[in-house]
């Protein structure tokens, strides 16, 4: 279709970011990446020798380098006519500039630091993901991200002066520990809100086969995040490593029971094939025992809160080194402190 077609995936993503940004600006949730600007330009700026040398020679951000090299290989195969048809590139490209998340994606963070994360880290991160979905669905029940995998969620380091944060989600209040990080959902090129943000990508034959459609299903994104997170290609350590809290594993299996992890109800890529809303982000936050401590009106004992704060501060300080191996043996002892 035309580059000016608002239903093209690239344009639908931009429109979706604009629609969702109001939730951040109105302080209903901080967990959405904000757009800054977009423009069109020639692809030559990204594939010429100068660009290649500049990006590939950088020592930081191995993931970015790897993805760029893959892009160059596809581009060069395409212009030679050796690539598949979907590897052909237009000479004019659309560039989206967005808010920067300074700690990379959640998959990389988990892989680097899971051995040293506190139980409260897992709980708060999962709360943040579910809360932003619940907030969006509260106004747009038919919203679907459709690709909410762990590496499409970014992480931002935030100030930890304020020890607890108050969340308002679907007319309920939650008091949540400040762990020093905010997740930011990102990559909306499969996303849609029928009648508000329509997306041609979710009306094709191949997406229908994997249940990526515009049909309302508030469970779909929840299932896709948790079920793909524990797959072999992502973060299987979550279910196998003893350092991951058992209550977090039990929580995941309540949200995605065994019969919804593999089998006839699930595509080989981990996608949910039923139209059933097994549960919703709002119901999970309001009813599941995993988040009970965030709902309770009773303040936790001061000694326990202070201990959590100390351990969280220690984690943030050490994680700033960017090296997951720097944690000493004392940090492992923290596992006994919090649920």
Label each PLM-derived region with a short phrase:
Residues 20, 113-145, 150, 159-160:
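Conserved kinase catalytic-core helix
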Residues 30-119:
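Conserved structural core of kinase catalytic domains
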Residues 1, 40-43, 101-105, 160, ...:
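Conserved beta-strand elements of beta-rich interaction domains across eukaryotes
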Residues 29-34, 92-96, 127, 139-151, ...:
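Core residues of folded domains in eukaryotic genome-function proteins
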């Amino acid at each position: 279709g035309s580059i000016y077609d608002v239903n093209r995936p690239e344009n639908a993503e931009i429109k979706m970011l604009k629609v969702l940004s109001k939730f951040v600006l109105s302080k209903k949730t901080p967990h959405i990446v904000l757009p800054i600007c977009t423009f069109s330009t020639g692809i030559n700026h990204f594939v010429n020798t100068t660009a290649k040398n500049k990006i590939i020679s950088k020592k930081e951000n191995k993931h970015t380098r790897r993805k760029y090299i893959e892009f160059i290989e596809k581009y060069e195969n395409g212009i030679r006519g050796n690539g598949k048809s979907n590897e052909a590139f237009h000479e004019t490209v659309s560039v989206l500039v967005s808010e920067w998340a300074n700690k990379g994606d959640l998959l990389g963070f988990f892989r680097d630091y899971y051995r040293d994360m506190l139980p409260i880290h897992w709980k708060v991160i999962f709360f943040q993901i579910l809360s932003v979905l619940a907030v969006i669905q509260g106004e747009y029940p038919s919203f679907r991200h459709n690709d909410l995998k762990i590496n499409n969620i970014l992480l931002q380091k935030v100030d930890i002066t304020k020890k607890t944060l108050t969340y308002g989600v679907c007319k309920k209040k939650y008091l949540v520990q400040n762990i020093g990080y905010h997740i930011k959902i990102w990559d909306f090129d499969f996303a849609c809100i029928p009648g508000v943000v329509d997306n041609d990508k979710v009306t094709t034959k191949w997406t229908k086969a994997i249940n990526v459609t515009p049909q309302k299903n508030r469970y779909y994104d929840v299932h896709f995040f948790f079920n793909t997170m524990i797959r072999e290609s992502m973060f299987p350590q979550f279910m196998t490593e003893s350092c991951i809290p058992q209550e977090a594993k039990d929580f995941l299996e309540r949200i995605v029971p065994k019969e919804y992890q593999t089998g006839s109800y699930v595509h080989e890529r981990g996608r949910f094939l039923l139209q059933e809303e097994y549960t919703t982000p709002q119901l999970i936050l309001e009813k599941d025992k995993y988040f009970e401590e965030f709902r309770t009106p009773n303040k936790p004992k001061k000694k326990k809160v202070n201990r959590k704060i100390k351990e969280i501060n220690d984690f943030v300080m050490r994680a700033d080194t960017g090296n997951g191996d720097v944690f000493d043996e004392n940090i492992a002892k923290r596992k006994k402190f919090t649920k």
